Amino acid sequence: NNATSATGISQYYYHNNGKQLTEALHQSLNQLPLPNRGSDTAKYVVLDQVTRPATLLELGYINNPSDFKHIRTAVYQKEIANAVTAGLQSYFKQTMERK
């Protein structure tokens, strides 16, 4: 069934200034139990109308029973929070080192 076949984690950016942020988050999200489908450009409204670095994270699919089993747990939610925090720290560290 195509409606339930999408699985895993994806990261998207639109403007080039969001690529480094997206890649830093991509690296930290690799530790999560769901497969990381990678990062790509996408022309989503939430991305294309911003001027600051921006990324869209898809952290699992609620219509996929396997993904949903993870998404609904406090353990997975904490893993997501920790991974996103680590990715942001990495991004800002890289940004500060370039200055």
Q: What kind of feature is each model-predicted range?
A:
Residues 1-99:
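Active-site-proximal helix/loop segments of hydrolytic enzymes
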